Swiss-Prot record:
Quaternary structure and partners: Interacts with claudin-11/CLDN11 and integrins.
Topology Extracellular: residue spans: 33-50, 107-212
Gene behind this protein: Tspan3
InterPro entries associated with the record: Tetraspanin/Peripherin, Tetraspanin_animals, Tetraspanin_CS, Tetraspanin_EC2_sf
Family classification: Belongs to the tetraspanin (TM4SF) family.
Membrane-crossing residue ranges in chain numbering: 12-32, 51-71, 86-106, 213-233
Protein name: Tetraspanin-3
Keyword set includes Glycoprotein: yes
Disulfide bonds: none
Species annotation: Mus musculus
Record-level GO cellular component terms: membrane
Record-linked Pfam families: Tetraspanin (PF00335)
Length: 253
């Protein structure tokens, strides 16, 4: 029964190490996705510390690849030192992922206040030129999220750009995709996106942080199983000094 249990633990452990390699790629992708998306919305969110969970996720992803390599070698060779190192590193990564989850929730709660403070400034500095980074950011968000203004299109009437142009219109990025003849005129509100951008930007950023949180939780659970299997192998060897290696001279014990 004990031999069957240890063999099963090793099989699961090798399989988990292969999963760790896949997880490494997924975590790095999630972290990179956060960076890319943040670059599109950075004008609406000034707190760069929000990127910290993404940085940690990428670092954890790189470390998981190394862990998978150590785990496979240690499991196949039944190296006591290797397995102990494997468990220790997994424990460190697990604690790190718990920190990521906590930080993710902390920054997720701050998103709404951060966006509310930043978006007011961005809309005030809009000048309608493609050379201005803030203007490009607003046009990009309005097209991508299908929104107009902070709370609705009427917010544009309070901007310096609207007062200077004096043509009673909003940026063309406010035009609905289906309104082919839209010129941004407030006289035709049905051609404009009715929803404001602030709520949608908040929702988008919170969704991104939730991706990070769920990725960290999912792989933390897998790592717990990996630590359990490695501990079973280690405990078996410590209780039974005569226990043979799983693979000895090319044959299974």
């Amino acid at each position: 029964m004990g031999q069957c249990g240890i063999t099963s633990s090793k099989t699961v452990l090798v399989f988990l190490n292969l999963i760790f390699w896949g997880a490494a790629g997924i975590l790095c992708y999630v972290g990179a996705y956060v960076f890319i998306t943040y670059d599109d919305y950075d004008h609406f969110f000034e707190d760069v510390y929000t990127l910290f969970p993404a940085v940690v996720i990428i670092a954890v992803g790189a470390l998981l690849f190394i862990i998978g390599l150590i785990g496979c070698c240690a499991t196949i060779r039944e190296s006591r030192c290797g397995l102990a190192t494997f468990v220790f590193i997994l424990l460190l990564v697990f604690v790190t992922e718990v920190v990521v989850v906590v930080l993710g929730y902390v920054y997720r709660a701050k998103v709404e206040n951060e966006v509310d403070r930043s978006i007011q400034k961005v809309y005030k500095t809009y000048n309608g030129t493609n050379s201005d980074a803030a203007s490009r950011a607003i046009d990009y968000v309005q097209r991508q999220l299908h929104c107009c203004g902070i709370h609705n299109y009427s917010d544009w009437e309070n901007t310096d750009w609207f007062k200077e142009t004096k043509n009673q219109s909003v940026p063309l990025s406010c035009c609905r995709e289906t309104a082919k003849s839209c010129n941004g005129s407030l006289a035709n509100p049905s051609d404009l996106y009715a929803e404001g951008c602030e709520a949608l930007v908040v929702k988008k950023l919170q969704e991104i942080l939730m991706h990070v949180i769920w990725a960290a939780l999912a792989f933390a659970a897998i790592q717990l199983l990996g630590m359990l299997c490695a501990c079973i192998v280690l405990c078996r060897r410590s209780r039974d000094p005569a226990y043979e290696l799983l693979i000895t001279g090319g044959t299974y014990a």
